Amino acid sequence: ADNRDPKVVWHPGTRQWIMALYLAGDQYCLLNSTDAKTWTRFQDLSLEDVSECPDFFPLRDDSGTERWVFWGAKGIYLVGSFDGKQFSPETEALICEQGPNGYAAQTWSDTPDGRCIQTSGMAGGQYPEMPFNQQMSIPVELTLVGSGDKVILVRWPVKELEALRQRTISLGPDAITPGS
């Protein structure tokens, strides 16, 4: 079951395809291709205690600098620079998703408005009286907040979900006490 879960993106700066691939254990690699048929492995990466389902995508930070995010199945990620030949992590491993209800997230590329949209699998929650035990998450928009090595990934439900709202409940600043 190793060596799977390819994620392929286009890198316009070098006019080549880039593939993030899970190898085994906590090991991944990056490959490139100009024709999407013949691939060359050019970098190995690891995310400690993370396996499967890599993702690799660009986002701009608060300073406007293009950064690349390397993401593993458990929502652990690295932010760094990528020149088409080398991914250079500029942060330690960061955590964006915790718990069993977010796994194997993937982004959608080339959205018409340039947003980075992500969905993940939800598996592990108990849903009383439901005829299923897994589902997809709602789509979220990803952005980077901060710059340099002080940057984090932020997820927010996509704006299209606002059209589904039917009513709003507002709660005042009441204190919540145990047993109330």
PLM feature segments, named:
Residues 1-31, 41-46, 53-57, 64-74, ...:
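Hydrophobic core segments of beta-strands in well-ordered, beta-rich domains
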Residues 15, 34-37, 137:
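Structured loop/turn residues at beta-strand edges in well-structured enzyme cores
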Residues 51-56, 102-105:
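Repeated scaffold domains used in trafficking and secretory/extracellular systems
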Residues 1, 29-48, 79-98, 150-156:
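Blade-edge beta-strand/turn elements of extracellular beta-propeller
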Residues 63, 83-100, 108-180:
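Beta-rich accessory regions
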Residues 8, 56, 80, 107, ...:
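A structural signal for short hydrophobic beta-strand segments in well-ordered beta-sheet cores
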